Each structure stands twice: as structure tokens, then as C-alpha cells.
Amino acid sequence: MILRLFILLSIITVYLQLSVGIQQQFEFAITLKSKILFVDEHWNVVNTAAHEFDELSALTFDESEERIYFNDGQHQNSSIFSLRKVGKSNHLAEQTIQRYGNESVGGIAYDPLNRTIYWSDLLQKKIFYASIDTVATEMPKILVDLSEENGTPYGVAIDICGRKLYWTNSNINHPTVERIDLNGTGRLAIIDKNIDSPRGIVVDQGAKRIFWIDDLKGIFFAVMSAQLDGSDVKLVLKDKNHEPQNLAVTRNAIYWTDRTTKSVWSHLKEPEIATTTTTTTTSTTQIPTVEGEEGTGAMDDNDIWPVGDFETTPKKSPLERKINLTEEARGIVARTGFYQLQKDSQCSKVIQLVKQRLDESQQNNRVLNVVDEQLDELQREHCLGGGTYYPQQKFCVCVPGYKGTRCETNECHNFCVHGTCQISEMGYPKCYCQPGYSGERCEVKKCLNFCQNGGDCQLDELTGEASCQCPSNFGGLRCEHNSTEICGLFCRLLKHDSNTSVPFGCHDICEQLAKDSSDLIAIPEYKHLDVCLAPNAWTGSVLMPLMISLILILLLLTIFIHGLRRLYKPKRPHIKKTFVVRKQARTNSSSDTPLTNRPLATEQCEITIENCCNMNICETPCFDPKLVEFAKSNCKDDKKILIHNMEDDLY
């Protein structure tokens, strides 16, 4: 009887612990100056902790064991503490890293596989690390020493799956974003251009990207993004009048703390517009506040600023203030669904090893008996959806597709409005929409308000894209263009400038408008311009290439024929004949005088035909005075004279 009563009391005790111990799960943790704030997904405060500290700054979240690690700058004995949230109003802070000097912690990161803490020291300009299992017996070790190069390590973040540590170097002369393997090898500066003063940094395991804050010159700041190897650098947003320090990421958004406005701000990870301004938003949603401070949700209208390449037209900004705080906001962490990454090929092995270590730790601290068997059954029933309960940490590890403190929420339940839901490889719900629907949750009907001005919306059977059948006098993809208004504008211009080109189809519209306003409207000369709508296939872009092709073919054919003629034409015979000049001069002319008759040649003069100027005797020094004297023909006839006096025929 006593044994049964003991078992019953034990079961009741455990049940109360399960039901009260973790009543509401937090999604974000924020360090203020003197406390840590826990808020849910709607940014409602669910708990506060660490009230005994006075100078909190950086923090990190071990999602595998539900522990917060944070820094206090004024504690005399320790610099880094751990906080285990055990209830709605209960927490336990423990000393983790002892203080060994005048440290100034800039950022903290935690590796759940090796249970190792990494932190940057702004004063010593080094990055340290220590295992929480051996920190009581071993001194922290140096992973990276930037003191010799005058570097300043600020933010640190761990790629848990890729086993690398990332940090920002805020050296004013040579700022960088760097990484190193967790074993201390392979240091590499992955970003060293177009960067001013980088601050906080975070690794997005799902998107396999890094995000960091860059404190730009003047009053501006930027949030940047890049692949894990430093490629594909993107500007997520650029704004002013903020003093951001640290940031966190979730599946869709980025969050950062701002000391100037004492707020937490958010922005989409994939912005619709790259450059934003903090302008007044049309949203009427009340911004959550802490301890009575009112929230406006946006800057004043006077803060709209047209500078450089930024937007000059006020519009609804994707930059959103999430919560107003009474103290200076410093560090921030977010729940990212660590165990949901077990579907990722790179992360699955790491997560399996972490779960294996937790299972071994749980088995080593248990003694099986009747009470334990009853507790096992109760704990198995506590975690729903196939989740596993860890009594030492007092939380459930959910399988992919489930979330909540008891894994009670199926992420696919009612997620897709008009479609089928499946859990993606990254552990997130994904919708496959029915024809005619789109959106992340298939909540958008493609034809809803798609066609304007009475247009009829139709869906393509193959692509599923929406198109519009527009009524008369309307056109455009969504029937957004009023043909009457457009033609009226052109015909008004035509009234003042006769060279104005009026679009096709405006003749009848302008003619109708001219009946009421003939002094303002001119009617186009041509009623139909079919050639503008359907150009002749034998003109323009078709005829010109065809003509060029024909000309090239004829040119090639001519070259080919000329080559054949040169190849097969018989060679011309080599002519070498001699023209002989007589030795005696004429004696039968009574007009011969020493002045008119040349002296007799002492010997025979001859010329070779092939040396003549193209069979032309006019330019040769040898001549026949008798034949040339009475010849009045031109040089073309010299060939006949030359041939006439040959010793024999040419051929």
C-alpha cells in the first residue's frame, strides 16, 4: 500500500513538473542592461531572468539543451554564465567561465557537438574557447590572436554543420569578415572589400548564408548577406539613425537590437526592395512594449531622407519595429529549430551525435525500477508527435514537422489553404498549390482581382498562369490601360504637332472624341495601319537577311568559277620573236637632208617581242623609218606593223 502511494505521489509530482515546468516556449531572448527578456512569436513577454546582473551584453542559445549563455561585464568572479529556464518564473544562473582579467566580451557562440563556448575579447583582441565539461580544471585557450595585426574581433558565430567559426574584424584600417575551422586551421578572410565596421554576425544554417551588421560612416548602417564561402554578397537593407549591435535570423526575417531607439527591429531576409527608409507605415498594429512604454512602430515623417541612391518617394517600408524596451537593447538570439535540420545531409550527422550524447547522459543517470517505468510511460505521453523527452533538461525534442513545448503542433496542420503540405528537406512546411492558387500557403487565388476594368480572367491549362480578355477600349496584361484616355492624349498632341505618331487603332476613338472637342482633338490621317501590327514576312527582318545571303552565295560562286578557269585554261605560248631594222637608208626621197634623215646605223638593231611594251612599239627605241613615216595610226595599230616585219609567223 505504501509502495503504491509512493508511486502515485511520484507520478503526480512528475506530472506537475511537466505541466508547470515549461508552460510557454519562448522564441526570442534579448539582453538588456540588467536582465534577459524572453518573448514569444507574437513578441509578448513570457518571462524575464538574470535580474541579479548589472552589465549584460552578448548572449548565445544552446537549442539542443535549452541553455542560455550570456556575459556580464561587472561581475568580479566570472565573465560568462549559463542560464537554464526551468519554468514560467524560475531560472537558474550558473558560473561558466571565470574572470581572468579585464575582459570585454564582444560576442559569444556555442558548439553543441563538442559543448564548447567561443567568445571574442575586444581588449585583448583575441578569440578564446573553452569546453564546459573541463572549464573547472582547464584554462581557456586561444583560437585566434589578432593583437599583432591590431585587429578587433567583435561578433562570432558557428556553422554547426560545416564545423567553422565566423567572426567580424572591426579594424578601422582593414575591416574583414573571416572564418576558421574549429580545430584552429584554415583561417581565411572571406570578405575584405566594401566593408566599413562590421559588428554582429550570425550563421543561417537553413539558408547556408551568413548575415552581419556593418556600421557605415556617418549615421548609416547596413545589413549584409553572403554565402558561407564569402561569395554572392548582397545588401539586405541600408538605413540610418540606428546603432545596431547584434542580430538573429529565423526562416523568413532578420532581427537586430538598436541602442538608439531601445527597440528590436526586423526586416525580410529576401527584401522586395533592396534599399529602404524608415518611413511611416500604414499598419495599425500595436507595437508590444515593456513596462508601459508606448510604441509608435515607425520613425517620424520628418525622417524621410532623399540621399544618394536611396528611395525618395515615401512608401510602406518592410523595416518593422517589433518591440519597445525600457533599457538599452544589446544581444538577441532566436529559436531556429535545431533538431529540424536533421533532414539536411550536412547537418544530420551532427544532430544524430548530439542526440546520441543526450541519450547516453540520460541512461547513465537512471536506475530502472517500478517508479521509473511509470515515469517513462508518462514522459512518453508528455511529448506528442513522436517527440523524445529529456528529463534532465526538461524539454521535448520534436521530430521534423512538429513543434511546441510538447511537440503538440503539426506544422502542416491547416498550413496550406488550397494545396497539399509536405515537410521540406530543411524541416519547414511547404505547399504544393492547386491549379489557380499561389502564395506560400496557397492562399492567393490567381484570378482574384487580377483583371481590371471588367476584364475576364482565364487560366492557361499548361502553365496555370492567369491572363485577361479585355473589354473594348481597354488593353494591357491586366486590362489596366484605357485606350480612350491614351488615344485622347496622342490626338491632343497631334493637334499641336502634326508629326506625332498616333498608335494604331486610335482613329475611331479620336474621331468620336473630336465630336465633342474638335478644337482640342485632331483625327489621324490613316484609319488602319495594318502593316504596323502584322509586318510583311518579305520585308524588314526577313527580307534583309535573305538578300544578304543571296549576295554572299553569288560572290562565292563567282570566285569558284574564276578559280576553275585559272586551273583548266591552257598556258599561253612563250613568244620570243625578233624585229630587224634594215641597214640602208632611203635614197629615192628628194627631201632627205642631213637634218631630216637619221644617220645610218652601223649595225643591225633588233628587239625581242616579249620585251616590248605589251606588243606596243611606240615606246621601244627600235623602229622602221619607212613604215613609221607614213603611219598615222595610233598605238593600237603598232602591233600590225610589228607583225608585218617579222622574220616568220608568230605561231
Curated annotation (Swiss-Prot):
Membrane topology reported for the UniProt record: Single-pass type I membrane protein
Gene: cue
Protein role: Has a role in spermatogenesis and oogenesis.
Species for this entry: Drosophila willistoni (Fruit fly)
Keywords: Cell membrane, Differentiation, Disulfide bond, EGF-like domain, Glycoprotein, Membrane, Oogenesis, Repeat, Signal, Spermatogenesis, Transmembrane, Transmembrane helix
Cysteine-cysteine disulfides: C383-C396, C398-C407, C412-C421, C416-C431, C447-C457, C451-C468, C470-C479
Single biological process term from Gene Ontology: canonical Wnt signaling pathway
Top-level taxonomic group: Eukaryota
Keyword Cytoplasm: no
Family statement drawn from the similarity comment of this UniProt entry: Belongs to the cueball family.
Disordered: annotated segments: 290-311
Segments on the Extracellular side according to the record's topology features: 22-540
GO molecular-function terms, A-Z: Wnt receptor activity; Wnt-protein binding
Residue intervals on the Cytoplasmic side: 562-651
Database matches in Pfam families: Ldl_recept_b (PF00058)
GO cellular component terms, semicolon-separated: plasma membrane
Protein name: Protein cueball
Annotated Gene3D superfamilies: Laminin, TolB, C-terminal domain
Signal peptide bounds: 1-21
